[in-house]
Amino acid sequence: MKGVAYLKLIIAEKPSVAKSIASALGASSRADGFYEGSGLLVSWCVGHLVSPMDAGGYDERFKKWRYDDLPILPEPFRYVLAPGKEDAFENLCALMNRPDVDIIVNACDAGREGELIFRLVYEMAGCRKPVLRLWISSMEDSAIREGFSDLRPGADYEALYQSALCRQKADWLVGINATRLFSVLYHRTLNVGRVQTPTLAMLADRDAKITLFHKEKYHLLRLTLDGAEAVSEKFTDPAEAEQASAMCKGSAVTCTSVTKEQKKEQPPKLYDLTTLQREANRLFGYTAKQTLDYAQSLYEKKLLTYPRTDSRYLTSDMAETVSCVIHLTAKLPPFDSCTDFFPLVETMVSDKDVSDHHAIIPTMEIEKADIKGLPLGERNLFLLVCCKLLCASAEPYVYETVTATFDCCGHSFTAKGKRVISEGWREIDRIFRAFLKEKPADGDGDTLPDFTGGQTFDGAEVVVTEHFTQPPKPYTEDTLLSAMENAGKDGIPDEAERKGLGTPATRAVIIEKLVAAGFVERRGKSLIPTKAGINLVTVLPEPLTSPMLTAEWEQELTEIAKGSTDPDTFMDGIRTMVQEIVSTYSCISEDGKKLFAPEKKVIGTCPRCGQPVYEGKNNFACSDRSCGFVLWKNDRFWTSRKKELTKKMAADLLKKGRTNVKGMWSEKKQATYDAAVILNDTGGRYINFKLEFPKRKVGADGRK
């Protein structure tokens, strides 16, 4: 239109990000649902505004869960507005369709889910205006401005969008069909997920190994020489250990060899999200979700770079900026007590190992940030990332290992020691752990005396110690995240970009879903599968529990995002698998049905047949269905008196045939009263009750 000043509409994923973008780009005027200024409108989604339609939306009959309606395979998929987010969508829709807006800028999170969030809103709004993509790894003003000066065509991310769609559709197809199928078969809601179920299978497998573990006893001989300790090989027979000890005590000992080897331990890599979550769990006990939430908050506060990354390297164009960040970080307590060092930035740089986002590091904003004012969780995580940056840029840790072997009466003993030559990056790690009051990550070991080959010792001191083999340890979030990341590793080529269950951005959600569904429980730092979780893994088919298969799917999604795999081929494979599972599992055995039956507690004995009576959701019923004896909690007898039959009242009725009830309501008198309720079972379909009122005491005048 002639004379119209056209605007760019920038859409962020959440209000806080939109505010930062608006501030950085000069859109300083706040309106209802957007910021405006400098030729820009800046608005926001509130997470996912558009989501796949529920099964019931495709057909009324799908509102009920029935085996005969499976599988449900919608084509095409339809989408609806997320409940409660209609206003946010209408605001964006109105802005996108404004005649003075000529370009839409997708500024949602720079990743698979961020792409999906924007695209679904764009499609549902019916917008056809050109799209540009803001792709940044930091919320610093300088990074936002630099990213905005280098906007990319939205079409460049079409493959990423297709990958996101395939992920969403696959989760819907597997989740809806498998959950309904096994819930109907086992008469209990059993939530099945494309990624969460194989994760549960790993937990169940570890639990089984712990349960079946048989500990074995063994013994060691410990020889003391000049204050150092040398240890024998294992003895499985205690008699042999005692015999060897008796032979060695007081005997001569000869040093048969001394081996010294200088070793170098390179600095650790920077954090990606998974390694950050793992270490935060080890050091602070934070769950994966807590760590992600803290990291996201620090990102939005401009103190950390983008957290949902799977790279542990930086790009070459960042070298100068990172060097400045390192020097700023080194001034922060407790790192300001470290020995001066010159950062080796080149060790952290690898362009080929950075795809969407580089490793997580602090930003230049730390120079003016109030670190002490951060909430404790965020402060701990921020300092952890700072520590890793300093360690990664420091000198290697250099040490010498010493291994001395000894002979005593034909038995071999070994002593090991270590001597630090240059502490390097471990100095920073040690200082940080001392600040946290944590032990060093790896003890330096004892320094051995200067043993020499051929050296002899008289009067050996020997003791026998008893030990047991140890079972595998339960998974913690640290070790489970590692297992998820490496699942299927052996079956995927080394050059593959992603191996494992889920992505760094989704693994925390998967763990939380398993806990919320009652399939996993937290015991301290350990994640333990519940009985229901173990049973679920037992009854599900291999395609739904195989970490290898699911890891292969995740790899295919990565290939789709790169444009090297056809999305339709992937989805055809998912649909075929769902159809095969539904057709294979049409019924289960009677024993199978009992797997998920709630554990019932006997509250009494049936007065008709003598069998146990159990509490159900709405009643107390005889365990023999043919008997028919049932006490309903909301029988009209009770509801008319504004009461509900409780477990104690039912137990009294079964044991004594009566129960005393206070505060029953009389509609006629509009008042409450107390009475004994008598069980009056005539053997019919319904149980009857009678009331017995307490006898009144006779007064002095003869009246009651």
Q: Could you say what each language-model-derived stretch is?
A:
Residues A239-Y271, Q277:
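Metal- or metallocofactor-binding catalytic centers and their adjacent structured scaffolds
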